[in-house]
Amino acid sequence: MAIKSIASRLRGSRRFLSGFVAGAVVGAAGAGLAALQFFRSQGAEGALTGKQPDGSAEKAVLEQFGFPLTGTEARCYTNHALSYDQAKRVPRWVLEHISKSKIMGDADRKHCKFKPDPNIPPTFSAFNEDYVGSGWSRGHMAPAGNNKFSSKAMAETFYLSNIVPQDFDNNSGYWNRIEMYCRELTERFEDVWVVSGPLTLPQTRGDGKKIVSYQVIGEDNVAVPSHLYKVILARRSSVSTEPLALGAFVVPNEAIGFQPQLTEFQVSLQDLEKLSGLVFFPHLDRTSDIRNICSVDTCKLLDFQEFTLYLSTRKIEGARSVLRLEKIMENLKNAEIEPDDYFMSRYEKKLEELKAKEQSGTQIRKPS
């Protein structure tokens, strides 16, 4: 589906884009856990039997072998938590907290590998083989770049419980730019909470009927989402009296260029909750003054030149030869992008290192 048609459909629906509206506070839990609590409650017993329970035999019979379990309980890791969909082999939601200190450090993703989550039973897990040759990338919900402070935290983001099948261009492009904006928020907000996850939204057919259908990949039938969502909650500081800032966004799982603005994909929190079946930040006092993050902040993503310069700067560290390093500079010039001071300092430092290394190698190979 084209970006324009999706965006126009979302903008055209008053129910979907009803503005910055707070939803009702309702507890959210896994279906198995909810069922267990429901049938164990005295009120539920009365509803089922038409009378107040008194240790009835019916209750004992129902619970004799237990209720079905869905595995949707919250699973906590070093810097993220998630609820896992055992049927679709993807997370339902992933919650993370980021701050200026957490996005800085020595943790490096080159030491991390995608792997099944050891906490997920293999029967319900996705595997790397499901993604190989599928035409879909392994897309992080909690990104590795938000966990530079801890090698363990970063490695845990590579568990496949934190991954969904994502369009390659979306993963490396628009979604990446949203993640970068979340990190940028830590320059202006002390605490930033982010919830991300997949959506499978209905499509309207020519006959007017709505259909939910989605591709699955691999032997384990990992579900490919039609859309991805991200909810951002930012707090200026723990002692600030300034209202919290919140924004919810839904983007299609397909390539998105540089022209669409993030605000074009903004939805109300209430509408996202209806779509996802989730209640976000249930302990948040929604009767308090909560601001639209796109009004308080910019919601501005990096443009083409800024993003290209950022990627080129990252490539400097991976250059293994002077020739490769000079190619990075050449590509920038061909794109008519002017290097900034930070890029030049990194470039010159790397150039000096590589020249010294190549000169040292030449001297070692020189015959005596």
From Swiss-Prot:
Keywords: Endonuclease, Hydrolase, Membrane, Metal-binding, Mitochondrion, Mitochondrion inner membrane, Nuclease, Transit peptide
InterPro entries the UniProt entry points to: DNA/RNA_non-sp_Endonuclease_sf, Endo_G_ENPP1-like_dom, ENPP1-3/EXOG-like_nuc-like, Exog_C, His-Me_finger_sf, Non-specific_endonuclease
Cofactor(s), by name: a divalent metal cation
Membrane spanning residue stretches: none
Top-level taxon in the UniProt lineage: Eukaryota
Record-level Gene Ontology MF annotations: 5'-3' exonuclease activity; endonuclease activity; metal ion binding; nucleic acid binding; RNA endonuclease activity; single-stranded DNA endodeoxyribonuclease activity
Main location as per UniProt: mitochondrion
Expression tissues: Ubiquitous.
GO cellular component: mitochondrial inner membrane; mitochondrial matrix; mitochondrion; nucleus; protein-containing complex
Binding, a divalent metal cation: N171
GO biological process: apoptotic DNA fragmentation
Subcellular location: Mitochondrion inner membrane
Residue numbers annotated as active site: H140
EC identifiers of the protein: 3.1.30.-
Residue range of the transit peptide in the UniProt record, numbered on this chain: 1-41
Effect of mutating G277V: Abolishes catalytic activity
Effect recorded for H140A: Abolishes catalytic activity
Gene3D superfamilies registered for this protein in UniProt: 6.10.250.1250, Extracellular Endonuclease, subunit A (3.40.570.10)
Family: Belongs to the DNA/RNA non-specific endonuclease family.
Oligomeric and partner information: Homodimer.
Further facts: The active site contains 1 hydrated divalent metal cation that has only 1 direct interaction with the protein; all other interactions are via water molecules.
Job of this protein: Endo/exonuclease with nicking activity towards supercoiled DNA, a preference for single-stranded DNA and 5'-3' exonuclease activity.
Protein's name according to its UniProt entry: Nuclease EXOG, mitochondrial
Species name: Homo sapiens
